[in-house]
């Protein structure tokens, strides 16, 4: 064993506190892998929260140190865009856009392409999870009414939302984290990410057009439309939300105003409403995701203090494997993202990346890897859950038949683009 790796291990043997920290870290990331802990009614957010509490409880960190471990700009940016997305959802924007696209008199391949484009574009500005939450019921009803293969359209929707969200530093939580921690410039990232994302959406469409030739595994004829009441389209509130979102994009692209501050101001403007009560808007904020971030920040910071993570990175470097290089980062990023999901994977890898180029690669890889497995992205699970309520069952095998080739294609496109 190399001296670099042996030293931290000797420290752990001599200090039970550090051994306990490592044990807490292992249990927390086991929970990230399993989606909870066996025999306990805990999801990933609950596991992360209890991990943070345990770290403070054993005296590894004071409450003040735990608070400093949380990257507040990321939390504030996440919260602010949850408010913006809530405004758009309450205004019926997502449902109305999807309904209008579904009503277009297009042949099946072109309709599929239109839905992929819309889902990808919306996810680049708003949360991919929210986009899937709003679009899935409409797309499911479209498939039932037109007798289209729902697996192709719904898995395509999830993949498009994931791919599209990689285009900007506000498209998904892990990109917000990477952009905030590494201080990536919004416009610079956009110009680097837009080509592989655009080509990735095109590759997704091409593969789905090919995949739809196979016989459908769902008997669409036996399905009936579930007429639930979507939000009523409110032009004024939608215009208000779009105006704030557009203003924020301009600020991000052309000014140096901190993104989290600008986003908070935008969220504050939206909360000044005579139509939507603030408590109603806050009800659409994903508090569990914020808790997940806070808990993982604390647990990861405690683990970093043991020196094990730095020693592991040094050991890899001594064997010619550098995390900053695209090859190892792609392999480790894809593997971790599908083991523990993309947000925890990003939080593990991010402290060891020092260059903007590595940050861009991680943002793209961790997001695109979410299409591989059904559990690789929350957006995938949202689509499957809402489809089930319409009587459409999508299992992990059906997802993998589309997700595997799409992930391989999009990662290959990204690798070629970044290596140019």
Task: Go through the PLM ranges and name each one.
Residues 64-151, 287-358:
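Membrane-embedded alpha-helical segments and adjacent helix-loop junctions characteristic
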